[in-house]
Design a protein with these regions (language model features):
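Processing junctions and N-termini across compartments
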Residues: 30, 50-53, 78, 97
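Compositionally biased low-complexity repeats
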Residues: 20-26, 76, 116
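Short, surface-exposed binding/anchoring microloops in extracellular/periplasmic proteins
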Residues: 39-60
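Secreted, propeptide-processed cysteine-rich mini-domains
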Residues: 25-45
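Secretory targeting and sorting signals
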Residues: 2-23
């Protein structure tokens, strides 16, 4: 009986962790990237940046240029020679509340999040 209780609790905790990981954005710096904690733009909407083969100062400048192009109904996918992939998170009503942008130009890669 004790073994069944332990297995039940273990499964509940494991499944809860998986559900939470899939639901909300999580700031993860991939291997080979450098975290840029002070790089923000658009009054803090764009934040949580990291870079590979660039510098945090360049990331900060790029995010400001990107923000200047982000005033339309859609997030831009091409800014300053970078091609950007965008992943969106939606709430229960289907409204976007966060995004992860991965922008690439040659070997340079900049990742940042947009959060309300």
């Amino acid at each position: 009986m004790g073994r069944l209780a332990v297995m039940t609790v273990w499964m509940a905790l494991t499944l809860t962790g998986v559900a939470q990981a899939a639901g909300r954005p999580r700031y993860a710096v991939p291997a080979g990237f450098t975290r840029c904690p002070h790089a923000t733009a658009w009054h803090g909407f764009f934040k949580w940046a990291s870079q590979r083969d660039s510098s945090c100062a360049a990331v900060h400048r790029y995010m400001r240029v990107y923000a200047a192009h982000a005033s339309g109904p859609r997030m831009p996918r091409h800014v300053a020679g970078y091609a950007c992939r965008i992943h969106y998170w939606r709430d229960a009503d289907g409204d976007i509340y966060a995004s992860r942008n991965t922008c690439v130009r040659g070997r340079l890669v900049i990742r940042f999040y947009g959060m309300v």
